[in-house]
Amino acid sequence: MSANTTTVNRFYELFGRQHDLDAVEDCFAPGAIVHFHDMPAMPYMAYKQVGAMYLGAFPDMGVVIEDQFEAGDKVVTRAVWSGTHTGPLMNIPPTGKPILNNELCVDRMAGGKIAERWQISDSLSLMQQLGVIPAPEGM
């Protein structure tokens, strides 16, 4: 396993299993930028705030890496997040419902750290699982 993939896996361990947002910061290069598919690009510190919001909403959050590969200076990871909605998520009160959320991340690495991240999560499915948006009939 390369140093770049090791760093990305460390991120998933620290955030997704240990819930240690302070330690996660070491995985990111100074000035790192994160792109969510449904939000403007943000610096790492704003990303950390989003992470804290999700950990507050899903304190039993866990993650499983399903696929991962490296190409050049990029590490691509497909992961599945799980948890129980026991805290507020934005303006959504706790529902007590379990969730599974698929995610795809492309991390551009520089100096063994994440310099830029493109993160796509299945927000529609998440909202359906929480009962905020109805799921299509028969699903």
Residue ranges and their predicted role:
Residues 84, 112, 122-124:
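Short coil/turn motifs at secondary-structure junctions
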